[in-house]
Regions:
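Short gly/pro/ser/thr-enriched loop/turn and capping motifs at secondary-structure boundaries
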Residues: 49, 70-75
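Short hydrophobic alpha-helical runs that function as membrane-insertion/retention elements
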Residues: 40-43, 61-67
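Hydrophobic residues embedded in beta-strands of well-ordered beta-sheets
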Residues: 20-21
Length: 333
């Protein structure tokens, strides 16, 4: 199963023998053997028994809490791995070091090239769209990355490339009733609501991968250090945004798996919230995407996106520890 999502309000999560049992109103909703679990994600309100928590920690299964509007609340997970050498290399590369600058270039190159790849695929399917100008801007930005030697300037290039992508995002939406507005948290439109939710799920999965490898998730290079921010998780998830989350969102909208009726608007705050049924459908699509296979261009074999999160984390660790000369971002062509 991999990840178990608890989408039922007022659910109770307990342990029976070697199984996790999910109940609501004394009715058993799910029973999953611990051996089949890698993570549990609770969306909304649910109660977890102390026995279940102890068993999850014992089996190194993370427990994540996400609010009903897709806001990441926190994760309970086992202690960091004992690989102090990875964290030592990570900290030594902090700041404006050549390694940090190179890593930031890689994160941004991967993100922008995958943005361009997404636009290229869509343009091929719908010749009436006018995505070429945005693709040209993104490519021009990518071409400038090697000419910049400080992280702040690289961040500026990342912003310019992202602006070109999101500037044509509405052209990628083929269903009525959905309009993308500038990125906003909390979301005040349905597309941003899906993005916030999807990126929260992606952040959790990438953070889990970097924890497995042995990184300190709070020390990133692209994202400015801030108290409580898992900077490295945000860094490494950049190259997966278009490939995983944006792809799932466009699939859900354009194939009418989600409709405007799957969203509600809070009367006072105008925050847009995905319904319980809508969350369930989105989670199905997200898990299916994570389990889908592709040929990884660096390792040269088929893998799932879930496996790719850890592969990229391990490649970054190898680079920082001097085992390889460059960090190769995941780029699909």
């Amino acid at each position: 199963m991999g990840t178990l999502y608890i989408n039922q309000d007022d659910a109770f999560i307990g342990k029976v023998d070697e199984r996790i049992v999910v109940k609501c109103n004394n009715k058993t909703l799910q029973e999953v053997p611990l051996i089949h679990l890698e993570a549990i994600v609770i969306l909304g309100r649910a109660t977890v028994s102390p026995a279940a928590i102890a068993e999850l920690l014992k089996h190194k299964i993370s427990l994540t809490f996400i609010s009903e509007i897709g806001e990441y609340l926190g994760t309970l997970e086992p202690e960091l791995t004992k690989n102090i050498f990875v964290r030592d290399a990570q900290w030594k590369a902090a700041g404006e070091t050549p390694q940090a600058i190179h890593a930031v270039r890689g994160f941004i190159r991967g993100k922008l090239k995958n943005y361009r790849y997404s636009l290229y695929k869509t343009q091929g399917h719908y010749s009436e769209l006018n995505l070429q100008p945005a693709m040209t801007i993104i490519q021009n930005v990518v071409n400038k990355l090697n000419k910049v030697d400080n992280i702040n300037s690289l961040r500026g290039l990342e912003g310019a490339g992202s602006a070109a992508y999101f500037g044509v995002f509405n052209q990628l939406i083929r269903a009525e009733g959905f309009v993308f507005k500038p990125r906003h948290r909390p979301a005040i439109d349905s597309v941003n609501s899906l993005m916030n939710f999807g990126y929260t799920l992606l952040r959790r999965d990438v953070q889990s991968a970097i924890n497995i490898v042995g990184f300190d998730p709070y020390l990133g290079y692209l994202h400015v250090q801030r108290y409580g921010r898992v900077g490295l998780a945000f860094d490494l998830m950049e190259e997966f945004r278009a490939l995983v989350v944006d792809s799932v969102i466009l699939n859900a909208i354009n194939n009418r798996i989600l409709t405007p009726n799957d969203f509600t608007v809070e009367p006072l705050s105008n925050v847009v919230r995905l319904s319980e049924g809508g969350r369930k459908e989105f989670l199905k699509l997200y898990e299916k995407k994570k389990q889908s296979e592709f040929k990884h261009p660096v390792v040269g074999r088929k893998c799932t996106y879930r496996e790719a999160f850890e592969i990229q984390a391990r490649l970054l660790a190898k680079y920082l520890m001097g085992e390889i000369d460059q960090y190769p971002p995941l780029v699909l062509k």
